[in-house]
Each structure stands twice: as C-alpha cells, then as structure tokens.
Swiss-Prot record:
It is found in: Cytoplasm. This is Restriction of telomere capping protein 5. The keyword Cytoplasm applies. The lineage of its organism: Eukaryota, Fungi, Dikarya, Ascomycota, Pezizomycotina. Residues 539-581 are annotated as: Disordered.
Amino acid sequence: MGQVLSEEKPAPLSHEEIVKELANIFAEKCFTSLELYSLKQVFKSLADHEQRVGYLKEGTVAKYLKVPGILDVSAVLFQMASYIAAFPFLEDAPAVLGLEQMVIVITLVTDRYRRVLGKRAADKTKLLFKSLAVYDRKFAKPAVDTPSHSKNAREQIGSDGQGLDNDELVLAAFDALGHVGSKKQQNMPAAHGAMIPGDNFRKLIMLLLLVAPLDGQDSLDSDPDRVTGAGLQSLRTAAESILAAFLDVEQNPGIEYHRFNKVIAGCLPFLFQGLAPLFEHFLFSKELDFHKGKGDTFRSPVMPPEPRQPLLQDTGSIMNASILSQMSFFIPGSFLFRRIRLLYAGDLDGFSMGSFETKVFNWRAPTILLVSGTRLLDESDHHSNGSVPAFWASLPPRRFPPGSSGEGERLAFGVYIFEPWKLTHRECFGGEETILFQLEPIHDLFRASPLNKDYVSFTRPSASTSHAGVSFGCPPPKPSQAYRRSGMIPLGPVSLMLDGSFEYGCFTHDYASSGGAFQTSMVREYNFQERLTLKAWRSGAAAGTRKQGTKQNNGRGKQEKLKLEGESTWGRATLKPTEHY
C-alpha cells in the first residue's frame, strides 16, 4: 500500500479521569484494605443517587458525623469538603461528594497525602483557606448538593480567581500524576478579594474546639454537656477569643489569606488537627463484626471497653474543656487531654506564695499556669488608701494603653513551663520550651527567645527584696541598695508579673523593643499593657496516674477580701528529654 501511518497522540485525559487516577493512587497508598472496605460500606449506606451516580448530601454528612445542630456549622463543613473534593482541579469546585471524591477529601484532611506527595506538600494552609473563602460575598454560592447542579456551579464560579497562586500541594499532585498537560492548571489567576466570612469561621472554630480531644472512634455526641448551658457558653467565649486573633469583626467583614496564614503559623499551628479523627469516622463501618465467623449462629460476647480517664479531671473558674481545647491548638493535645491534674487551687489552698510553693515545687514535670483577672481602670480613677495606689506606684512610669477597648473585661493569661519550679536568687529558671500566652479576650502567643534567659522567677518576700512575686520575662531581683531604693518592679519588654499577694498583675508588650525573654506578638504589632486585679489563676502539671489532692482551708476569707475567685496549679506526665515542640 506504501502509506506510512502517522503516529496519533493519545487524547488528553479529562479532569474526571485524572481525578479518578489520583483517587486510586491515594486509595492504594494511603489506606488499608480494611479502611477502604469500611469506607465503601459507609458510602453505600449513606449515598443518595441521581442518574445512577452516588453522592453525599450536606444533611447526610452532618448527621453521620453527629455534628451538633446548635453550632449551625453543617453548611460551612460541607462547603469545605466540597471544595477539597475538586482537588487538584480547584477551578472545578464545588464538587459532588462521590466515593472517589471522599477518598481525596479524607486523604487530604487527615494528612495521609504526605505518603504520596512528599515533603514538598507538607503545608495545606492554602487549601484550607480556599475551601472556606468566598470571593465576592454578594455572589457567594453554596456547595453543590447534587450532580445536576455541578456544571452550573462551575460556570458561576468561572474565572473570578478561585485560588491563591503557587499552591505547592496542587503542584505536587500534578507531579505525582505525571500528566504534563495537567500542569496548565498551575497558571490559575490569583484570587482578588478572597476572604473567609467571620461568622462562618466562628462556627468552624466552635466545631474545632469540640473535636480537638476526640480520637478516631469517639463521637461528637459523647459529651452533651459541652454543647449545652455553661459548656456551650465556654465554647463561644473561646471561639470569640480565637476569632479576635484573625479579625476585628467591627472593622473587617472577613479574614484575608495573609492574615490567616500568619496567625495559623504563629499562634495556632494545631488548629485543624481535630478534623482528622472527625473524617476518619468514614473509615469505621458499624456493619463489620469480627466476633462472628461464617455460618456462625452464636455471637460471642463482646468485652466492654475499659473505662477511660476523664478529659479533664478537675475544673475551675478558668480551666474547663474549652480552655483545654484552646491550649491544644498550640500545645500538642497528647500532652493535655486526660493527662493534667490539679496541683494547687488558691480558693482551696490559700492565696499565698507559701501555699503555692508547698503544692507546686515538688512537682518534677512540666506545669501550666493560668491567670485570670479584670482590667484595672486608669490610675487617675483610684483615690482610695487601699492597695491599688501602691500597686500603680510600683510600676515603671512608662505606660502603654490596654490591648483592647473593653473596660472591666476579663483577661486571661497563661504560661507553659517545661522545667520544675525553684526559688529565684540571682538567675531565672526555665528554658526555650517556655511559652507565654493569652487566652482572653484575644488569643495570642509569645514564644521564648534564645537570646535572653529571664523566663521565670519566683521571689519570696524578704528584707533584701523590695518586691516579691512571680514573673515571666522580667529581670531577676538585684542585691543592691539602689535596686531596693527604686521601689519599681522591673518589667521585661514582653512579660507577665504577679505581685507577692497574688492580688494584682501586669502584662507588658513593648513591640518596638528587642532583647526580651519572649518574642513579640505576631497578631498585635503595637505596644500595649494590661494592668489587672486577679480574679482567678491556676497553674498546671499532669502526671500519668499520680493524683494531687487539694484541701480546704481559710483561703476563702482571703478570697473575699481580695475579691478573688480561685487559684490553682495543673501538671502533666513527665516527658522524655527529646520531646519538644
């Protein structure tokens, strides 16, 4: 015939075919055969069908995960899942939650993707932001619930800039797939005006606080007290404090990416970790029965599970389950949940440095100190002969305005101390693992600086010491007459000071200075100072199964005199020397 057949290039794969290929890779390398079987069984039992295509609806997902209706977060969670389901073609979002899409969602949310995409794709912050963001609130669209709406939704989203450019996670997925043509998707335009609505993020934070202590098979409805009454109020309070780190709701309608990324990296590195055990619920099918063989008619009895330690054995006027969850966003939850024990309570053991020393100093494990109080009014408003004027006089004359505008609002600070407590003579104690943080009314974090070692001091009252007390980030007392005559408490650039009576405290943030024991805030780039009258404070350390008792004494009389509510100390189990964070 003499004709040479020209080589025909294979037609490029469609988005659907590439997504299916990626889902197969994830399924093979990121799941066990039992997990895949369970996922298929769960999906089969939950899926609705349209045009012979199975998919999950918003209400179905929320009901299966037992998301409390009082949180009103189902739509936000479904929007996030539907966006991630379109990966790596995020311009196709929102996607229908079919079986393959659920494989992709679970792989990404639980961080299993690292087994395939490698270290290059270690951070999914951009993906999470885009999954929660809207690009024009006026035309914001709900997530797709059925296949028939999918095409129309894609057309509406169109080319308004669906994502932030240079997403390493997306690029790593294209590299893993090896489809050169797919890399054209790298050139998506950057999003303009993309932001997460503050109200949506508040709802999600409440859910994240709720799921933070859960294991893979724990249910969201296992502790109904957390979403009713005082438990619900504490969830809302913690969520408002965390939201305030991202956004001033009175000035901005939403959270932009640069702020989102900055706060997550600096203050809340573990914020989204609770989503992993939540979505792993899809990998546990209730239909699996390992106690029954083929053809067996008799089912062997199932041994009841061993009782678990409570999430928090002791609560107080500061410490509760929501505060514990909030701290787990920057201290690993494995250090906190079911591991902390009350060491010292001021309203039970007495408000004195001696009582504190007796209860805490023999503890040889890390501790957490929490302090709560009410902001003092301006110095000019105090004309009494009480202790307030004396406290004001002990502070250096250089004063900063408060960190927020609310008069008389509750303030809460804390310190994570890795080393055991000891008396301070000429040198402070503590190490670079020490963390100074604020919990209310705004969440903030001040990590230790390696340049200055004035981390923690505990100074007893004595004739040679003009000011006793507990301080963090302040220089230790000096044995000189000039120091004693000054009558001033030396405050560090970033520091927390509690006076010797545990009646007053002062937090200082000198943003313009450098060389302090703690780094300045990544959230508030300005100077501020909080002078407060202490209402409650506690410090913490936990230890395996060792229990620390508390006893009542005459501390309540002093509590009324000082208008204090409580004081306590918490501790956790001893860590191996290599365990740092």
